[in-house]
Amino acid sequence: MFMGEFEHSVDTKGRLIIPAKFREQLGEQFVVTRGMDGCLFGYPMTEWTALQEKLKALPVNRKDARAFVRFFYSAATECELDKQGRINLPKSLRDHAALTKQCVIVGVANRFEIWSAERWNDFSTKAEEDFDDIAENLIDFGM
């Protein structure tokens, strides 16, 4: 399970250190792709495979399903860690998440997310303000 919040920076070549706690769970290869809310999603191969099965089951006759799958897969990249525990993020992914220097990597149960520090600060400030309301709304989902 991925949890915690870690600050790192992207270098000029697009390399980003993955936290040691996450590296242990990721294995040799994993996938990073565009995420929602302006961040990137990272999945261990087992989670990525399970997600692929769900995405393949979406109806191709639905325009929104086609658009989502196309957008999600088109930027997906298999990553391998170098000897320093870094991955190389393609420019398209860095652009999607506005990653220029300071990043925040957060654990979100079965995946991790990569945020620009600025976007993460904005998101977490808003989430903290709305936390009670969000929690109350989740009661509808059995929480």
Swiss-Prot record:
It is found in: Cytoplasm, Nucleoid. GO terms for cellular component: cytoplasm; nucleoid. GO terms for molecular function: DNA-binding transcription factor activity; transcription cis-regulatory region binding. GO terms for biological process: negative regulation of DNA-templated transcription initiation. Pfam families: MraZ. Residues 5-47, 76-119 form the SpoVT-AbrB domain. InterPro entries: MraZ, MraZ_C, MraZ_dom, MraZ_N, MraZ_sf, SpoVT-AbrB_dom, SpoVT-AbrB_sf. It comes from the Bacteria. The keyword Aminoacyl-tRNA synthetase does not apply. Gene3D superfamilies: Transcriptional regulator MraZ domain (3.40.1550.20). NCBIfam families: division/cell wall cluster transcriptional repressor MraZ. Forms oligomers. This is Transcriptional regulator MraZ. It comes from Levilactobacillus brevis (strain ATCC 367 / BCRC 12310 / CIP 105137 / JCM 1170 / LMG 11437 / NCIMB 947 / NCTC 947) (Lactobacillus brevis).
